Amino acid sequence: MELSFVTYNIHKGIGTDRRYRIERIIEILRSVNADVYALQEVDQHVPRSRNHDIAALLSEELGMHYVLGLNVKLKKGAYGNAILSRFPIVDSRNINLTWGIKKRRGCLAARINVPRLGEIAVLNYHLGLAAFERMWQIKKLIESHTFSDMRQVPLVLLGDSNDRKMKLNPVLDEAGFPDTCEHNRGFNSFPSYAPLFRLDKIYASKHWQVSDHKVIRNQTTRVASDHLPVFSQLII
């Protein structure tokens, strides 16, 4: 059985042209037609994004199940990570990965019931800007009760790592979650208009085999967000 996964930092639907155009994000997600999307920087009731509940809006437009994990509260509204799934989401938890007084960060974990397969786990992370912060966050995530529980089923861990130098890959590889990008090179996703860094990554438990991995780069994705969406097709 093949399932497709996408991680995409949508930058609140605000493109590199500084315009809020959620219809561009909808167009991109619809054209990719993945089974599961892990989205970061998803606004809920924030003026800059027309007070939209973006996760609910995307869910309705795409006809998908969704769950939202809010991490950062603003004067009006909040934002965080969202998971959209073609299949029912049966459980979700938001893991707090905030280090000290740094910006609030989290990992949204969901169990998804896939027909003819059973449950899988999808964990959507958005890590910090400092190297020491990211290392602490990924170790805390791996050691969490939620992660220990969800790794009992086929698991995909994906999101915006902010890890330009691939320092987290050895830690995750040792934990049994190799990068789905086999050669660990190329496939840069940031900034979208001229990608120099591979910040957006997908890791999978050894239940999975990779059949395809790519960055979605076209005229629309170059402007819709400051990140490009990253896609993996996995076989189980």
Positions of PLM-derived features:
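Active-site neighborhood of divalent metal-dependent phosphoester/pyrophosphate hydrolases
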Residues: G13, Q40-P47
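Short active-site-adjacent helix-start/loop capping segments
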Residues: H45-R48, K75-G77
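Short, flexible, glycine-rich and Lys/Arg-enriched loop motifs at helix boundaries
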Residues: V46-A56
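Active-site regions of metal-assisted phosphoester/phosphodiester hydrolases
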Residues: M1-V36, E60-E61, H65-L68, V72-I236
